[in-house]
Amino acid sequence: ERFWNLWIDDMVNRQVEAVVYMFDDRAFKGGNDALQQIAGFKFLVDAILNRQYRYRNWKARRKGKKYMPKLIMLVANKADRFFDDTAALLWQQDRIGEHKIFDPFRDDLIRLQRGGVPTRRSFMATRIGWNVENTMVDLLTA
């Protein structure tokens, strides 16, 4: 939480084209971990849509006023914990955005889409190496 401003500053200063926001199943279970994950994404969305960045100098201010990432990818990590028959069916039909794991972020995803920022969603399980490369390639080729 205390580093969120620094992430936004770095993202704007480097003019990052693609943003990956990774979360895990704790966002769906509730508690303080869920609050941190959901609030972090909301902070990111608010900063992008409202262009509320801290500016260190005039050049950064000029760059920041025009900045908008080309893509935001929301990635649900630890898929080995929540991947069930419903997830498999949605995966086959290329409709993973409808999975319940993305429900806590749905309102902010809609806000991004209304603001003209393309979004993608994906699953991965980094611990076992499932779908990690495919997700990153998908992000880079979007």
Predicted regions and their residues:
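Switch II (G3) loop of P-loop NTPases
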Residues: 1-5
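Structural alpha-helical scaffold elements that stabilize or flank donor/cofactor-binding regions
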Residues: 11-12
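Conserved GTP-binding G-domain of TRAFAC-class P-loop NTPases and closely related GTPase folds
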Residues: 15-142
